[in-house]
Amino acid sequence: MGEKEIVDGCVAACHIAYACSEVAFTYPITPSSTISEVADSWMSRGRRNIFDQVVSVVEMQSEMGSAGALHGSLSVGCSTTTFTASQGLLLMIPNMYKIAGELWPCVFHVTARAIATSSLSIFGDHNDIMAARQTGWAFLGAMTVQEVMDLALVSHVSTFECSVPFVNFFDGFRTSHELQKIDMISYETIKKIFPYEKLKEFRERALNPTHPTLRGTATSSDVYFQLAEARNKYYESTPDIVQSVMDRLAKLIGRSYHLFDYYGHPDAEFLIVVMGSGGLTIEEMIDYLMEKSNEKVGMIKVRLFRPWSIDAFVKKIPKTTKRITVLERCKESGSLGEPLCLDVSTSIMRSELSSNNILVLGGRYGLASKEFTPGMALAVWENMISENPINNFSVGIDDDVTFKSLFVRQPRLDLLTSETKQCLFWGLGSDGTVSANKNAIKIIGESTDLQVQGYFAYDAKKAGGATMSHLRFGPKPIKSAYLLQRCDYVAVHHPSYVHKFDVLENIKQGGCFVLNCPWSTLEELNHELPSKIKHQIASRDVKFYVIDAQRIAQESNLGRRINNILMVVFFSLTNIIPLDLAIKLVKEAIKKTYGKKGDAVVNSNWKAVDLTLESLIQISYDKSQWISKDKCGEKSLPATAVETGNKDQEITKSTVLKQKPEHDVNQFVKDILGPVNALKGDELPVSMFEPTGTVPLGTTAYEKRGIAMSIPIVDMNKCTQCNYCSIVCPHAAIRPFLLDEAEFKNAPETMHIPKAKGGQEFSSYYYRIQVTPLDCTGCELCVHACPDDALHMEGLQKMEAVEKTHWDYLIGLPNKAEKFDRTTVKGSQFQQPLLEFSAACEGCGETPYVKLLTQLFGERMVIANATGCSSIWGASYPSVPYTKNQKGYGPAWGNSLFEDNAEYGLGMVVGYRQRRDRFRELVSNEILKDITEEEEFLKDDNASVQGRNEIITKYDHLKDYLRSWLKNIRNGEACQSLFEEISKLLEDNLINSNNFAQVLKKDRIELLEKLYDSRDLIPKISHWIVGGDGWAYDIGYAGLDHVLSFGEDVNIIILDTEVYSNTGGQASKSTPFGAIAKFAQSGNLRQKKDIGSIAMEYGSVYVASVALGANYSQTIKSLLEAEKYPGTSLIVAYSTCIEHGYTKYNLQQESVKLAVESGYWPLYRYNPELVRTEVVDNLTTIVSSGFTLDSKKVKVDIENFLKRENRFLQLIRSNPELASMAKDKLKAHSDKRFQKMKDMSENVTVTALKDQIKKLKDQLISIQNASKTGELAASGLINADLFIEQEMHVLYGTETGNSEEVAQYIQSQLVSRGYSSSSLNLDDLDIDEFLNPDKFSTVIIVTSTSGQGEFPGSSGILYEALLKKHLENQDDKFCSFMRFGIFGLGDSNYVFFNEAAKKWDKLLLDCGAVRIGAVGMGDDQSEEKYETELIEWLPDYLQLINAPEPKHDEKSEIPKATTFKVTILDSCRNDILNESTGTLCEKLDENNNIGNSHYKPIIPPNSVLLPVIENKRITNQDYDKDVRHIVFKLIGDGGDTPSLSYCLGDSLALYGQNPVNEAIKAIEMFGYNPYSLLRLSINEENEANNTNKVNQRYSSLFGYDITVLQLFVECLDLWGKPNRKFFQEFYRYCSNPEEKIQAKKWAQNEGKKLIEEFSSKTGTYLDVFKMFESARPTLAQLLDIVPFIKSRSYSIASCNKFVNGEKIELCVGIVDWKLESGEIRYGQCTGFLNRLPILDSESKIDSIPRLPSNIKASAFNLPFDYRSPVIMACMGTGIAPFRAFVQNKKYIRDVLKEEIGPVILYFGCRYYDNDYLYREELENYVKEGVITSLNIAFSRDPKGYKTSNCENIRYAQKMYVQHLMLENSQEIYENMIEKCGYFYLCGTKQVPIDIRKAIIQIIIKHSSTTEQVTSEEDANSILNSIQIMGRYNVEAWS
């Protein structure tokens, strides 16, 4: 007998395989991976085999590779083995035929596993074995862990003795992963039986040139057959040889085996034949039946399945046998029976038993490790003895479709005695429970004489799923190969499980129950525990204990690892071994398990062990009270079909396969998801399942696992709305939400929802970041990604209720994604993630990429997903995280295999393209074929059809859509939009009505029906092939390489975790040098495959390397470019993984950044479309390589990255010398690669050529500039000292990529002017490099601002270094050599507007640098965002540095290709001015009818038409300022529903119109007919177009017919002020050469003066065209250079509640001025308002004006407390919002009956008599006590002109508001500072500056001495803090 050890089946097999082999070729596949890992571990530790040699364990790229390499190794005489399962075995079949054909001795160790069919399963059955049974290999099967070892040795010996290769197989998981105490076979014993002589013979057959032979010939039909038959004798002799080996082994080890072993009654009448672990359960059942009633039942265990020995089998059958049942763990569809059953039947038929009339029955059990319990075994026997037994039955399921399943009478039959203790542990995936229980088994088994068994069940979730550890201990051998039926001890390690699972279902009477939870008192437990649990505890006299293991783990610095704590609890309560000894052994196990992770981890675990017992609490419960608890009020699982359905339904109906299965998600959740997640899936009947395995999307949203201990909680006061938390969230569990006014008002009161920040598109929304508490995993990534510390973690139980209420409300709101640019970091996160709540590990690095893909392209994605982590978290039945959007669109997902995913995805692309090509032919050749006469497609009797013209128009629109589709067939966004339009049009007129059928001929209708049926081919599918590095670098690489070479339009993303994550962390060819992984446990000593460089070699593949955690914008940019690229694209995505072993897992983003900054993971993009070449002297040189290195500098030493991850630290601890060498090699490799990429990025291959050209240019430019500088200096325009060198670099700091884009644009402008320029990330420079005067004497800095005045992620390091140097050398102006310009990107809604740019400016000036020009202040609140300022700032800067003019060529002289296409139609429409309304209308014909095309006003996106019911002047008629009070009626389509809702401080954005008569003149000037109809569309001929960038204002016109007059009146801003960008393009349109020369001057540096002079005269776009008569662009060209009319926003002067939501009131000043010519001109919008009729309540007109309008949200923050003081200051029409504020206060006081605080108003006017607006109303509010203090400053009235009789009303003359505030400073200070009031200001741009100065003076004056506010700086700091809190609010206008 050998030594006893506790091992699982994998280790048992490995022990023999390692001993008897010289080489093992491996590839990881579950569940065989453990064998490979153990062998690799032994190899790394130097363990030797029986040949006294360390086995060479070689990991291959696939199972195909392993089999091929193994075949080669055998061919040269090397004893070789491998380990595999399932698909892996199938991949080896071709080589298995070859090996068997050549009679090579060999053993495959196979952990038998299910084969993927309609779904994948990693669990055990015999389908893979049966699929390979025909290959000519011998198959030897084991039932127990002991048998695995013994029969493995039989296999290895037999294969040499009979020259037939063997498969040694055993059940996957049930045997492979079951822990048992077994007798090990020593190497000495193995050597005694090993056939060394046969080994010698084998080696003599090896291929060797000293005795050469040849194998593997190609044969013809004349000899092939004979060769096949020549091997017969080997197979005929094999059974006897195997039996001989078994007999010899028995003498050595004392355990006897036979080809077939019998067990049972010697005179059995009923016999069961079985193979594998199921036989153990049959044994228990036989013992039970024989003991109970001496039943004559027996069993034959099949050992040698192939070659099958009839004689050996028949000899084991008792002569008394009447019936035989063959149990099979496989299914062979379409066969008469499964393979074993056929073998048994054939054996009986061919033997002497054929005349005995033995009935042979076949049945299936245990597929994919389905449980096979004693109760099921009993059901098999009961079926066999029944009068009418079922043949081809199934057992263990409920087959209510074909009704072949057996009824299990005793499902909980437990055949174990009380001697065997059974313990069940419910753990949370990755919490360490399983590993702790493995240690516990080993401790018990090694320190006692008890037999042990351990089996561990998991769900398919990567982490956070349920784990069930089934442990048995007893004095006798444990045969029970099934889960626990009755438990002595139950431990539940996560408190949520008591609500989810029936955890005490199997607990015995008097059992022990341990619950890990934060509830420690009986009161808490009474409240928290479900009634059912309490009833079970009391009714079974359960001893109940609780412990808060999470608290202990946190105190011990263990995070969430509670395993060892609860193991100590187990030992303390079970008394299996003395407690002191147990704790000692536990600590030793901890040292052994965690030693590689360092002493700190070990010590933390030891501390937790020591704290455990004092924290264990036994609960004394009131048994009578608890036992009376019933299940009332409990959440129960929904009834399943087996409980409610009818089993007598006709089979034919249930077996019909639908072509397009429709899934009711709710029904699926009810019938399948709920029961499966409650671990009741075994009870589901067959009828519940869709035959093809198709499942509905979005089922994870129903799970609500609640596994996080703590969740992120947002402080919206700190949140800067960057959305970073959302983009990093692996589970889409935290998201940004936008709410409109109505949604905001209906939101839960507990939810803080501030105004949305950003550009104008956000202006009408509120914003909230929200977590879904029950879907969050608590990884904390969002907390660490937040730049503003706006997130912190709180306990789930504390926050669940309120946060769930918030989430439920927000998730039910309409998604507003369509209104935002999904191509930005922020905008992408407003898109619904179509991957949510997956079962990936907490902090998973893969899911954020796929989630982001779904946000960018999800509604049109098709995904081919390789097997691996991404297929498991992405599609583990029935949990599907992929979901659909509100329109029902979402990713379509498929999985084939591990190895063929690239080919699978390619097939999708080719197949879809083929179908789409046919569809395109249908559209172009049939539906749109040229038809000149309407009669050819119209019915003869169509004239009388009502609405005929309208129907024909719709049909014409359909054809227009289809034409547009043909032109945009490769444009994803356009096709998606057209798909929706076409589908709707067809549904409205073909499917849901007979409109088209009334008018169109039958053949047309049939074509349209075909079109509708195939409409899903309209979208341009975004094809994505998704997989991990194991697939891409190894097993699937050949296929991947083929797809890369193929050139199809398909996108590939490799989620590169650098190990085989799914199978447990084995090394792949992606594993980095020096990392420790399984199969590389001594450190991986080969460099990682550079798959990106390999792909780039094709020259036709788009390639990008990305790391989301390091650079969000680069990742998004890469994904967008890849998807747009018209060919194959490859994204290599750095994906963090728990296998990396982060020292602090929640800080993994920092590790990602270090990976990039150290050069370990470079970020780059290669776009073949950007490759440019030039031919110089017949030599083709690369001008642009198409390669962009986005991580432009190595910033930190690679060691900083390596030391954060345990995969590298393990090597440092175990072998410091090797680790040091590995680090040096990895660094050298990374540096070399970085330099190569830098060279590629800079095109150094043509450096010499460029240098020569540059020198010549420089000489010429220097001559030119010397002249120009002199001229400019002489003229005084520029100081000669400021002349700039011809090298100028643009440095940027960016967070989202916008600053980088601006920098690149500026760089391109510099390059076009002859400068040598580059754009560099600020932090890519170190300080010494930055202070190099030879390179950076002139720079432009472009930077955004992050958070509350912080630097963006890529610019803080250099700034801090420069600041430090300055502080150390304040008198040293070390930057005096530098000239700089600076441009900031910011949002004026933020307090620290452009703060980063201001800080850079101040620091550089302090260091002696000289700024050129002003600081550019880009503002997201401007109409064109930062571009508004940029197009003014950059030309000014270029003029100041005397930059040369851009180089001009022929292309620069002609107009560019237009963005739009304008089609002038043949028909016209007579639009005219409606004198009553001042707007356009359609003229009726002589019969008062309108034509076919109706006039409809153009309504900009997100706008509505509001009727004007009042427009009256409220200033004196003789006063020069015309101020209007304008009222809009809020009546929607419903008659009395407001069509717009607004709140305090909001503005109404109005779209003005141009004067009709002037527009007609302008149209005629451009040569068009004002009344011609036109149609606007994208110009498909302009390939540079990107429809994603097309403004909604333009795209909203697509598909509509408008007149040229309507375009000029309602769209083109021809009467607006031209910007600099216009002049830069305008000269191209001048056909007269002289005019072109003159116009070009306006585009050059000197043009600024011309433009300023022109603007001073308020020139318009139209004026420019009048000046240059030859410039007559087409309408399409006009659309490119003349913008659309912009909205003008006016503060709303009414309170919505005060006016009952019935109207909007404005106070608008009409803007007008007189030109030198005497012409009166008006502001664009106010001029339009001025042209409207004067209206009041008495006005009587036929129709009223309706104006396009929308709401723009206010930046004002309103107080939550009505009693907070409110101080308001305004000038002129700035009174508007404050009038609304005062109305609101009156409403609160008079209607809501709430107390209000002080209301103080400071109002600046010119004259009391002329412009004291709303005087009577305001002073009445004072008298009513609403306004506390009214203060009016009249700047033009003489002093003393008017006085007030009311003490609360103050008049002051000859002063401005700020002066009046200073006079009343005490009032201001008391209410604003002391009482924490809110201050509001509304006025022109200069006013906020003056007011702020006044308040600062007030703070200084009234602050107490203890506050030490003695300077403006201190006071300003106080005011800044008030502003950050939202209590200082400014709205200013120019």
Swiss-Prot record:
The keyword Phosphoprotein does not apply. One of its GO terms (molecular function) is pyruvate dehydrogenase (NADP+) activity. [4Fe-4S] cluster 2 binds at residues 776, 779, 782, 786. Residues 1288-1438 form the Flavodoxin-like domain. It catalyses: pyruvate + NADP(+) + CoA = acetyl-CoA + CO2 + NADPH. Binds 1 FAD per subunit. Binds 1 FMN per subunit. Gene3D superfamilies: 3.30.70.20, 3.40.50.360, 3.40.50.920, 3.40.50.970, NADPH-cytochrome p450 Reductase, Chain A, domain 3, Nucleotide-binding domain of ferredoxin-NADP reductase (FNR) module, Pyruvate-ferredoxin oxidoreductase, PFOR, domain III, Pyruvate-flavodoxin oxidoreductase, EKR domain. GO terms for cellular component: mitochondrion. Residues 710-739, 767-796 form the 4Fe-4S ferredoxin-type domain. Keywords: 4Fe-4S, Electron transport, FAD, Flavoprotein, FMN, Iron, Iron-sulfur, Metal-binding, NADP, Oxidoreductase, Repeat, Thiamine pyrophosphate, Transport. Disulfide bonds: none annotated. GO terms for biological process: cellular respiration; electron transport chain; pyruvate metabolic process; response to oxidative stress. It is an enzyme of class 1 (oxidoreductase). Its EC number is 1.2.1.51. It comes from the Eukaryota. Its cofactor is FAD; FMN; thiamine diphosphate. Residues 1501-1759 form the FAD-binding FR-type domain. FAD binds at residues 1542-1553, 1685-1695. [4Fe-4S] cluster 1 binds at residues 719, 722, 725, 729. May have an important role in respiratory metabolism. Cryptosporidium have a relic mitochondrion with no function in energy metabolism so it is not known if PFOR has a function. Arose from gene fusion of pyruvate:ferredoxin oxidoreductase and cytochrome-P450 reductase. Gene fusion has only been found in Euglena and Cryptosporidium. Homodimer. In the N-terminal section; belongs to the pyruvate:ferredoxin/flavodoxin oxidoreductase family. NCBIfam families: pyruv_ox_red. This is Pyruvate dehydrogenase [NADP(+)]. It comes from Cryptosporidium parvum. The gene is PFOR.
